[in-house]
């Protein structure tokens, strides 16, 4: 009889999020990033979207009972992930249901998807309130400028100091660790600037700003990269830094990927693929 396989070295990462048929965002982006960074990726689908690189035309929330069934079947009967990323939760009921599982999950990263790239709100106030509650149970939250403002019920930060203040305020509201993504906020040197805050203080994270319109799924990619790296890094900050470095490279190679006729996806496999496809 063959010996039982040793799975101790296999990092497992779960994404709880919506589906993007174009493959650039949602669970598709999550699983690509996790796989590219050496984790075994798994998924629980919370919503089906009709979207492409040109935009979203529809969202169908998966019934709460079926989301619970997916989670129970995976977690109770088979695999407990080493890390979990949580993304799109379209309704308050979904957010509250997923929140019930947080105490049993390790290394949880919440990407509070609430605002579209256009700046339009994707969730009603009841759902926003449920996501706020979820923020206090996750190990790390990764809102962008607009999402941080929605969580705090104030205007988006217009400066680095404002970004720092909002990160600290999110911590004051109960979030354990916060990474506020600066997005289009211009740093002192035109860098892409994010702010990380935890119990030890605040860190300003800078990376070169890449000039490209192909940025579909950047938030999904970053949060799932952090989750997949955290089990193999000594600290959350180290995982965040390495994930940000990976994302910068993925954005930098996005134009070479050349997929779609709108805002194309980043290149999740830029470290693996070659021009010959080997």
Language model regions located:
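Short pre-catalytic strand/loop immediately N-terminal to key active-site residues, enriched for Gly-Thr
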Residues: 16-22, 202-216
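Phosphate-handling active-site elements
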Residues: 37-42, 203, 229-243
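Conserved N-terminal subdomain of the carbohydrate kinase-like
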Residues: 2-15, 31-117
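Conserved phosphate/ATP/ADP-binding segment of small-molecule kinases
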Residues: 125-202
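Short, small-residue alpha-helix embedded
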Residues: 33, 149-150, 213-236
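Charged C-terminal helix
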Residues: 10, 58-61, 77, 237-278
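Short beta-strands and strand-loop turn motifs
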Residues: 15, 81-83, 109-116, 142-151, ...
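Acidic-glycine-rich active-site phosphate/pyrophosphate-binding loop
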Residues: 2-10, 26, 189-205
